[in-house]
Amino acid sequence: MAEFTSAEKVNIGYENEYSTDAMTGGPDKRRQLYYQLIQSMKKAESVDIIVSFLMESGVRMLLKELEYTLKRGAKIRILTGNYLGITQPSALYLIKRKLGDRVDLRFYCEKGRSFHPKSYIFHYTDHSELYIGSSNISRSALTSGIEWNYRFSSQKDPENYKEFFRTFEDLFVNHSIIIDDKELKRYSQNWHRPAVAKDLDRYDFAQSETNDTKIKPLYEPRGAQIEALCALEDTRAEGAQKALIQAATGIGKTFLAAFDSKKYEKVLFVAHREEILKQAAVSFQNVRNSKDYGFFMGAEKCTDKPLIFASVASLGKPEYLNEKYFASDYFDYVVIDEFHHAVNDQYRRIVEYFRPQFLLGLTATPERMDGKNIYEICDYNVPYEISLKDGINKGMLVPFHYYGIYDETDYTKLHIVKGKYAEEELNRTYIGNAYRHELIYKYYCKYGSR
């Protein structure tokens, strides 16, 4: 999906761009708030933003310009709301991850009053200008959505400017709380995707479909991936060399590993199935924009590429874990997929042999039926986790239904070996059970994928 990430990427000549004080949105880019904000941001000595909510899509659009503004030495303050949970945690994490503490980011905290302002204030050497209207920070609100915004200068209307800015200062200083790591984590853990967010996301998606299709798509972290990346950066800053990420299937753990390992030169990705390795290779290729990788599995034993995707069955053999193939410190970053298997012999040999700068374990199911402890392998360090339930509540995964169907198959005559049904007997029971086959097909036809 195409992304507007900076003024350069949208290929607009701002020096000759038509400037207007009245922005009404729609398809004409000259009437969209985003392009006017960029012009103001390029010159401002400080920026104050007050909006009722932040969406990841809007933050992503403004991120590069905010970063350039900070590099020029300008100060940025942002006050937003947390009422009804419309502000997305990923939007806040994105600001924290890319801009850090250089931005003074706060929540409006007075519970007794509604909070719906939308204003962008830019301060220059001899004057200020203020945009006020209907646009929060989301893609559609900043671009083609029908939003009415007006800009005026402190020189042309000093009295009204003073009133607006005085109110902003009062709200920011006296009616806000700083969004530090603790507050952000608390907000994220309690956040459920509100119903209205579905409409906002739909508007943003529709807007992305109408963007300039000549812009090269960028692979960038989304949602929970942004939160997990922040957690991983924090844990490394504290000195951790190993970590386990627990995330439900569908969150995007492989892409997360690709994003997190991007700064490391030599990376090893370990999984137990060839299909997973090939899919992971494509993900890493897209994130790194490089096909310089190889596989270590079956008959293929690549050892000279910066990215190696290895099967446990091959790499886990003692004859391959030596200097002839890989030095123990060859890889800077090691990813162990399906980390709940890491207590098994082949996985353990791999984990114990290599000495990377950082080891990342990925799993959706950390609990094991045999009671073996996988947490000790990653030094009991789990910086981020998101369950299936949380993923659904946050709108990152689709909800589903379980259907319990009674099965009359008789298991009483099967032998139990080491606490389990004898595998051959169980297979015969299933394979030769025509009634069970018909039952499965009947209810498959009834429910399908609804």
Predicted regions and their residues:
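PLD/PLD-like phosphodiesterase catalytic module centered on the HKD motif
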Residues: 1-222, 226
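Conserved RecA-like ASCE P-loop NTPase motor core of nucleic-acid helicases/translocases
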Residues: 52, 267-273, 450
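Pre-Walker A adenine-sensing motif
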Residues: 225-237
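Walker A/P-loop
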Residues: 237-260
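Conserved helix-turn-beta segment of the N-terminal RecA-like "Helicase ATP-binding" lobe
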Residues: 267, 275-300
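Conserved helix/coil segment N-terminal to the catalytic DExD/H
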Residues: 298-330, 344-349
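Post-DEXD/H (motif II) to motif III coupling segment of the RecA-like Helicase ATP-binding lobe
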Residues: 340-402
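Conserved interdomain linker/interface between the two RecA-like ATPase lobes of SF2 helicase motors
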Residues: 382-449
